[in-house]
From Swiss-Prot:
ATP binds at residues 10-15, 127, 136-137, 199. One of its GO terms (cellular component) is cytoplasm. The keyword rRNA processing does not apply. Pathway: Purine metabolism; AMP biosynthesis via salvage pathway; AMP from ADP: step 1/1. The gene is adk. It comes from Clostridium perfringens (strain SM101 / Type A). Residues 126-163 are annotated as: LID. This is Adenylate kinase.
Length: 216
């Protein structure tokens, strides 16, 4: 089973990716992990990627694509995989398609966890964290018992810079501009499956399993 996982920041992709990986016994492949591994192991692609990053430049598509190709040819991908964070653009999706076609393979489904912008804003801007012990809270869904204080150590909880309304809106705008053409790409290929991400975590996973089926 070969799956592409799509969804906005704050949609819970990481949580669902872990559950899908465990349920269907396929590796969860994130571009972040691929980059870190290549760079830490000083592979030729890792060295090339790091040279761009050190100069404050974006890593070219071809480098990312080649890293993903290398990863998909490893033994643990023989029975499928879950791609998270790739493809991000139609160009990358086309490159993935071409690579799979050469191997007489194809993506089984592009799984979109769909969550309205307002819901994401509430979910992400409400997050709070304790800088001392790392405990996580949410001002609406899981607030600390003592207003503004960590239940575990008593420190003041804070909002991370990534969770401010301005930052979240910027990330969502980037996501929409980048991902809508990608959603249309998979929709036109009749490979897109959509899940309501506003449900409870277990309900989202149940919906995903209905789409993917019961076979491992």
């Amino acid at each position: 089973m070969k799956i592409v996982l799509l969804g906005p920041p704050g949609a819970g992709k990481g949580t669902q990716a872990k559950s899908i990986s465990n349920r269907y016994s396929i590796p969860h492949i994130s571009t972040g992990d691929i980059f870190r591994k290549n760079i830490s192991e000083n592979t030729p692609l890792g060295i090339e990627a790091k040279s761009y990053m050190d100069n404050g430049q974006l890593v070219p598509d071809e480098v990312t694509i080649n890293m993903v190709k290398d990863r998909l040819q490893q033994d643990d991908c023989k029975n499928g995989y879950l791609l998270d964070g790739f493809p991000r653009t139609v160009h990358q999706a086309e490159a993935l398609d071409n690579f799979l076609t050469e191997r007489e393979e194809s993506i089984d489904t592009a799984l979109l966890i769909e969550v309205p912008k307002e819901f994401i804003l509430e979910r992400m801007t409400g997050r709070r964290v304790c800088p001392s012990c790392g405990a996580s809270y949410h001002i609406k869904f899981n607030p600390p018992t003592n207003d503004g204080k960590c239940d575990l150590c008593g420190s003041d909880v804070i909002q991370r810079k990534d969770d401010t309304e301005e930052t979240v809106k910027e990330r969502l705008d980037v996501y929409e501009n980048q991902t809508q053409p990608l959603i249309d790409f998979y929709k036109n290929k009749k490979q897109l499956s959509v899940v309501d991400g506003t449900q409870a975590i277990n309900e989202v996973f149940e919906s995903i399993c209905k789409i993917l089926g019961s076979d491992k």
